[in-house]
């Protein structure tokens, strides 16, 4: 199972408010590569949805029946969520919960990010 940006931002905001923090999370789905770079320059890492190996998104294997809409959903089988932590020319630094901090090709990252719907959350 997984979720995308909106419920992550909502959950983060509930937690931040409960902690008395002035920080807030925002669903910035649709942000451009330039927009991501602006958040990073401002010191704000960004949670992004990509694939495990920056390959094209794949679906299949099963279907989900969404209880609230009755729709059938075919889930991604290689979906992954990481924190975009830096950008230096042709490479991006991501904090990957499976592989730790690593550098990836910026063009491949952006292509995958766009293919996954440019989904992102920033906390600032």
Segments the model singles out, each with a brief description of its role:
Residues 25, 46-49, 83, 93-95:
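Structural recognition of the beta-strand scaffold that forms the well-ordered cores
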Residues 1-45, 117-124:
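Cysteine-nucleophile protease catalytic domains, especially the papain-like/related folds used
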């Amino acid at each position: 199972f997984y979720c995308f940006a909106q419920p992550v931002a909502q959950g983060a905001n509930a937690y931040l408010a409960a902690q008395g923090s002035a920080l807030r999370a925002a669903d910035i789905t649709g942000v451009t590569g330039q927009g991501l770079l602006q958040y990073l320059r401002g010191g704000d890492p960004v949670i992004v949805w990509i694939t495990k190996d920056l390959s094209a998104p794949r679906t299949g294997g099963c279907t989900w029946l969404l209880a609230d809409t009755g729709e059938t959903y075919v889930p991604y089988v290689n979906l992954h969520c990481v924190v975009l932590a830096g950008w230096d020319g042709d490479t991006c630094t991501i904090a990957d919960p499976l592989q730790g901090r690593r550098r990836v090709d910026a063009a491949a990252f952006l292509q995958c990010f766009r293919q996954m719907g440019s989904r992102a959350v920033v906390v600032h």
